[in-house]
């Protein structure tokens, strides 16, 4: 489906409803995962049917899901498939994405059970892995050699500035990531590669090997902004194998092995943490030499949190701005002020400087790994991955004057809603 098409979903539409200043921990409780019938576990249905893959597979309830495995097959985001010319579609106010996001794929799927994720293990009873939505869109499966052939021959028109290999929690994921990376580096030397890692199955040696094979940037999807939210949404609270300590162990290894500016971590805002929690992680990652890649929580259809509200837009805007100040303006958390609830009430900078950053608009664009040009701080556009086009959270394009006026108003609302001032 095209990026503008909204998936049919039981997810409630919270837009326009009165909203609290932030999503508190008591509100943001995921449902408990239900038991999966034995005949649906570990991709049993797909393996029993054993339908042979025939080229590109687009998720479709009217067809048997083929038995596809990495490294021969990979899945890619809808935006990447449109950019590559594999799918037709329309993206609101943009014609392409500049990052080719690839996802490893197996009939068994991801063995983790993250509460906010459309790929989670608990969905085995409902949907085969290759048919699950992820970050709000379908991910068609494509022979990896076909992907490489298109990009290596210039079939993408030079639009991709980066490729990202997204690992999942699966016994083959580490080895297959190395295979996918090695083949890409050998054939597509002009597009650098990022690794979105799975720390749960990794060691320091794995990180070192990926660096040696030519990975340019290494990232960790920390996602949760404190230990409690992590455990509740992707650890023992939802029968998932991930550990806060293990994720930070691999993040520290990446900082040492890849070095400054060549590693980062994903953070999701709005899952029950405070502003102070988020920005504490942002500062910690920056102190190590890396960058934070921010996502606004938006309920994913089929996840254990699809009944919960998205992050309030005013809170999201103040976090986006504060994160940008820390990551790219040499600002520091210690200069900001927070109220007793942990809400940001003062950026700790003169109002004129804050206004200038808002007016530039870059702080409110999608954040991720950089592009090939020196001033391109994020090639990862992820069009509408954390919001519908009618209420954009992360802008996948340069903001125009109307967009700037809107985000400025939302920042003002965010600071007044937190009972504070915008600047010093």
What are these regions (language model features)?
Residues 2-98, 279-424:
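Auxiliary Fe-S-binding modules of radical SAM enzymes
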Residues 73-75, 79-124, 155, 162-165:
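N-terminal pre-triad scaffold of radical SAM enzymes
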Residues 196, 200, 236-237, 250-276, ...:
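Conserved strand-turn element in the central/C-terminal portion of the radical SAM core barrel
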Residues 203-210, 271-287:
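Catalytic cores of alpha/beta
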Residues 154, 184, 210, 254, ...:
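Generic structural signal for hydrophobic
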Residues 162-167, 262-267, 296:
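Short beta-strands and strand-loop turn motifs
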Residues 122-176, 189-206, 210-248, 291-293:
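Core AdoMet radical
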Residues 177-193, 242-260, 313-330:
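Alpha-helix-loop-beta-strand connector modules within alpha/beta enzyme cores
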């Amino acid at each position: 489906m095209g990026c503008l098409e909204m998936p049919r979903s039981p997810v409630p539409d919270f837009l326009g409803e009165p909203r609290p200043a932030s999503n508190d921990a008591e509100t943001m409780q995921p449902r408990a995962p239900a038991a999966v019938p034995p005949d649906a576990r570990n991709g049993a249905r797909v393996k029993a049917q054993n339908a042979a893959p025939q080229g590109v597979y687009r998720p479709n309830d009217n067809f048997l899901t083929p038995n596809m495995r990495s490294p021969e097959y990979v899945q890619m985001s809808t935006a990447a498939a449109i950019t590559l010319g594999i799918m037709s579609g329309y993206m609101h106010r943009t014609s392409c994405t500049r990052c080719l996001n690839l996802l490893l794929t197996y009939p068994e799927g991801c063995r983790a059970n993250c509460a906010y994720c459309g790929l989670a293990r608990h969905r085995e009873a409902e949907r085969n892995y290759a048919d699950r939505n992820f970050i709000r869109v379908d991910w068609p499966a494509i022979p990896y050699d076909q992907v490489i052939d298109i990009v290596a021959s210039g079939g993408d028109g030079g639009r991709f500035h980066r490729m990202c290999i997204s690992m999942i929690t699966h016994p083959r994921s580490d080895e297959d990531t190395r295979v996918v990376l090695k083949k890409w580096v050998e054939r597509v030397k002009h597009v650098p590669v990022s690794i979105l890692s799975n720390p749960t199955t990794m060691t320091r040696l794995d990180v070192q090997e990926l660096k040696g094979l030519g990975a340019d940037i290494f990232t960790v999807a920390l996602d949760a902004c404190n230990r409690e939210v992590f455990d509740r949404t992707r650890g023992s609270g939802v029968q998932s194998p991930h550990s806060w300590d293990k994720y930070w162990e691999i993040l520290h290894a990446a900082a040492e092995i890849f070095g400054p500016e060549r590693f980062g971590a994903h953070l999701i805002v709005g899952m029950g943490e405070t502003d102070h929690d988020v920005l504490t992680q942002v500062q910690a990652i920056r102190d190590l030499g890396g960058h934070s890649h921010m996502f606004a929580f938006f309920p994913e259809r089929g996840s254990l949190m699809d009944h919960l509200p998205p992050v309030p837009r005013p809170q999201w805007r103040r976090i986006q701005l504060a994160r940008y100040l820390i990551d790219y303006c040499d600002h520091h958390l210690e200069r900001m002020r927070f109220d007793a609830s942990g809400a940001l009430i003062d950026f700790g900078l003169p109002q004129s400087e804050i206004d200038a950053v808002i007016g530039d608009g870059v702080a409110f664009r999608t954040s991720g790994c950089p592009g090939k040009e020196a001033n391109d701080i994020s090639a990862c556009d992820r069009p509408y991955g954390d919001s519908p086009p009618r209420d954009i959270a992360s802008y996948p394009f340069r903001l125009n004057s109307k967009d700037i006026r809107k985000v400025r108003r939302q920042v003002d609302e965010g600071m007044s809603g937190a009972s504070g001032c915008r600047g010093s």
